[in-house]
């Protein structure tokens, strides 16, 4: 385990901070948004339209985050300014989070929510890539797992404050309770997010980065590409600060080159990313639809939140257990166990008919949720070049952002065909099965020279 005060433990505190916002976004933000958007008042809309606009906002956020993540990561790797950019994304994200509680209209609420999520997601690119700087490869699994564990547990603290304001507010504050609960929820979460991150601001040092010699080789290779060379020259002619433009253009060019390298040479990384996309899509879809299952079982919103907190606590324990097991077993072995566990959870969904069964399913999800995410992060850290960790995690983040995309389409198709939500969730077993196969292929593939797993 991380020693208190060590840089590894300090790094893990950001999991505690950002997870608080994740939990708020999952449980309460949709409720607050609907309270502003739905109704017969001026500027308000129907519930269906509100849901559609919310989905559109999430789509915009996902696309923007996927585009800027790799670029920012590549720039940070080359300019050795990972901490500076990370700090900026956190401060802007926290500020937007707190401001979100004071928004008077649902339109402004959505705009600021999207802004918060974009900077939140950008911060995760840099945070995940810091793993290669704060620990050795033989401890990455443990450190990553402990980060997720404390994140699940620590996020409950500000969330319980927000939940208390939301539930108890009507009895104590009457008409203004919902507005005040929003202000309290966003403010407490934002302050928590920032305060627990301050030690990381102070202590983190970027150890791995692209050397000047490697940077020159990259530039030389880019100059051999006529399209990239001509595009950069043309833009530099019309820009008063060609250095900045050149940096951005080179970042895009490098990302293109890295993707090409992954597809043609670094196939271990490529196969893992395919596996990750499939099984993490299944994870995201199940999480998203647990609430729908609870609704079908006549579980009210408070009961659903209670089960959500229960899952968080179980996920904390599961991450700690798998973190300890990582000292004895290979990362891929533990990933196989987690994927198989989720496969079983999907099939178990077919038998759900009461709240006891729903609780068992929530327990199963919690056991493997954090562990699968943490071990995926640490395994990826081991098989990529550490000096390009920011850029690679930007690409990793694109695959993570796709979580629940394909699964949601499958869920919708099954429901439209007349199937139950139980059957729809059970179909997610296919994603875990195919993801398992691709992970096996990645595990057997020759490791790149930078891996030491």
Where are these regions (language model features)?
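Short, small-residue-biased leader/transition segments that mark boundaries at the very start
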Residues: 2-10
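Short amphipathic helix-loop junctions that connect adjacent transmembrane helices
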Residues: 26-51, 288-304
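A membrane-interface helix-boundary motif in multi-pass transporters
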Residues: 45-48, 166-191, 413-432
């Amino acid at each position: 385990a991380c020693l208190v005060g060590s840089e590894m433990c300090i790094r893990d505190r950001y999991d505690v901070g950002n997870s608080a916002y994740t939990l708020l976004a999952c449980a309460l933000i949709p409720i607050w948004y609907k309270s502003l958007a739905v109704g017969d008042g001026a500027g308000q809309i129907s519930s269906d339209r509100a849901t559609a606009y919310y989905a559109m906002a999430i789509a915009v956020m996902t696309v923007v985050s996927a585009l800027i993540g790799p670029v920012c990561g590549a720039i940070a790797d080359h300019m050795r300014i990972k901490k500076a950019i990370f700090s900026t994304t956190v401060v802007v994200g926290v500020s937007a989070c707190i401001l979100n509680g004071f928004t008077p209209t649902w339109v402004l609420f959505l705009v600021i929510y999207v802004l918060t999520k974009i900077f939140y997601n950008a911060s995760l690119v840099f945070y995940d890539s810091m793993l290669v700087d704060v620990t050795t490869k033989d401890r990455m699994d443990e450190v990553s797992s402990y980060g997720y564990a404390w994140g699940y547990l620590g996020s409950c603290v500000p969330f319980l404050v927000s939940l208390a304001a939301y539930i108890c507010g009507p009895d104590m504050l009457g008409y203004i309770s919902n507005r005040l609960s929003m202000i309290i929820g966003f403010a407490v979460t934002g302050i928590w997010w920032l305060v627990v991150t301050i030690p990381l601001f102070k202590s983190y040092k970027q150890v791995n980065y692209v050397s000047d010699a490697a940077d020159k080789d990259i530039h030389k290779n880019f100059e051999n590409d006529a399209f990239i060379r001509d595009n950069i020259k043309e833009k530099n002619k019309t820009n008063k600060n060609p250095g900045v433009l050149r940096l951005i253009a080179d970042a895009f060019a490098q990302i293109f080159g890295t993707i090409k390298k992954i597809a043609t040479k670094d196939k271990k990384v490529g196969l893992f990313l395919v596996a990750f996309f499939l099984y993490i899509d299944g994870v995201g879809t199940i999480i998203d639809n647990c609430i729908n299952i609870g609704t079908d079982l006549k579980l009210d919103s408070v009961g659903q939140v209670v089960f959500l907190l229960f899952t968080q606590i179980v996920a904390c324990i599961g991450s700690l257990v798998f973190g300890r097991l990582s000292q004895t077993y290979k990362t891929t072995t533990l990933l196989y166990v987690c994927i198989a566990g989720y496969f079983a959870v999907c099939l178990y969904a077919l038998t759900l008919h009461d709240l006891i069964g729903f609780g068992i399913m929530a327990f199963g999800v919690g056991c493997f949720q954090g562990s699968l995410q943490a071990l995926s992060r640490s395994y990826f850290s081991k098989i990529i070049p550490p000096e390009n960790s920011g850029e690679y995690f930007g690409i990793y983040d694109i695959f993570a952002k796709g979580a629940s995309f394909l699964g949601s389409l499958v869920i919708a198709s099954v429901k439209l065909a007349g199937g139950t939500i139980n059957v729809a969730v059970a179909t997610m077993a296919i994603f875990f099965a195919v993801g398992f196969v691709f992970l096996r292929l990645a595990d057997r593939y020759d490791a790149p020279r930078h891996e030491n797993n």
